[in-house]
């Protein structure tokens, strides 16, 4: 069982790699806890896959409650915690079985490492380690050095990026050329009740998604091409602010109808807020959004 809202490459892995190998995936709306519980009872899955903060609409499933249901069904819960990072949420402490992070993103944080991390308990460690040895999941020594260098400053960077994202999201809410803003700290967020419970430190991540008012793809491209400091890039979690167009990047493998069903519209962009002065990020967004 997997959440309907996932990173596009994760969706592709489940449907284009696992499915031909005989692993069926049932996609469920993880914003509906009863639907998740019913799906687990009906299908008795071998695993459950979800994200702490869903990409790109930043919905926040009730991880702790889903973990309890998974444990009751003796089903491993796999959580991608890349957006939230261990600074905000530690899924293993909430009952998850396996946690994955893109090392490329916040943990290394400088856009110069390609790698990932799997964190688990002793029960799953041995088979995962054997799989790693067989398939060659070994990071090179220099990449490992760069990653460890990045981890040393990770808390400082993350706190700054979270604070910046709060300011940017708040500013975007009142911009005349923005239709809707998606950010976990929004008091009107549909998952606000359990966001407070899951994010006790008051840090809500550095990702902000928003819809450009009345924009088609050409208008979105004009906005992104008008950015002077923020980099149009297919990544996130760097010290530099970056903007991505989900319809043409992270979720490009989905059909337009599939994206529409998920709520990923053609005027949606995803902003990874960096460590720059928040005023500079806001100024760049403002001039780009006002560009004809």
Q: What label would you give each PLM region?
A:
Residues 109, 141-143, 199-203, 261-266:
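Short, flexible turn/loop "capping" segments at secondary-structure junctions
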Residues 147-156, 205-214, 270-274:
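Short, well-ordered beta-strand elements within core beta-sheets of diverse protein domains
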Residues 166-240, 254-260:
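Conserved small-domain helix->loop->beta segment predominantly found in fold-type I
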Residues 15, 214-215, 241-292:
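PLP-dependent enzyme catalytic core of the Aspartate aminotransferase-like
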Residues 128, 219-223, 281-285:
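Hydrophobic side chains in well-ordered alpha-helices
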Residues 16-19, 134, 225-229, 286-290:
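Short, solvent-exposed amphipathic alpha-helical segments in soluble enzyme
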Residues 1-177, 182:
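Conserved PLP-enzyme active-site core in the AAT-like
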Residues 75, 114-115, 156, 179, ...:
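Structural beta-strand/beta-sheet cores of well-ordered domains, especially the beta-sheet scaffolds
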């Amino acid at each position: 069982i997997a959440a309907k809202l996932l990173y596009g490459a994760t969706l592709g892995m489940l449907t284009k790699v696992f499915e031909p190998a005989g692993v069926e995936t049932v996609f469920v709306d993880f914003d509906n806890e009863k639907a998740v519980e019913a799906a687990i009872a009906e299908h008795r899955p071998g695993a459950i896959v979800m994200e702490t903060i869903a990409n790109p609409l930043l919905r926040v499933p009730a991880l702790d409650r889903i973990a309890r249901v998974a444990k009751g069904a003796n089903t491993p819960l796999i959580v991608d915690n890349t957006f939230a990072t261990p600074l905000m949420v530690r899924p293993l402490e909430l009952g998850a079985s396996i946690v994955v992070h893109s090392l490329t993103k916040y943990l290394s944080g400088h856009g110069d490492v390609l790698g990932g991390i799997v964190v688990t308990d002793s029960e799953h460690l041995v088979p995962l380690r054997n799989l790693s040895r067989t398939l060659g999941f070994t990071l090179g020594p220099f990449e490992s050095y760069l990653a460890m260098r990045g981890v040393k400053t990770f808390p400082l960077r993350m706190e700054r990026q979270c604070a910046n994202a709060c300011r940017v999201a708040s500013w975007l809410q009142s911009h005349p050329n923005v239709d809707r803003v998606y950010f976990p700290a929004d008091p009107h967020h549909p998952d606000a009740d359990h966001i407070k419970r899951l994010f006790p430190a008051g840090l809500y991540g550095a990702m902000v998604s928003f819809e450009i008012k009345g924009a088609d793809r050409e208008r979105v491209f004009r906005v992104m091409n008008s950015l002077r400091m923020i980099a149009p890039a297919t990544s996130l979690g760097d010290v530099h602010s970056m903007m991505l167009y989900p319809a043409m990047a992270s979720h490009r493998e989905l059909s337009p109808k599939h994206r529409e069903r998920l709520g990923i519209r053609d005027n949606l962009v995803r902003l990874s807020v960096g460590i720059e002065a928040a005023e500079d990020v806001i100024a760049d967004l403002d001039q780009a959004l006002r560009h004809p």
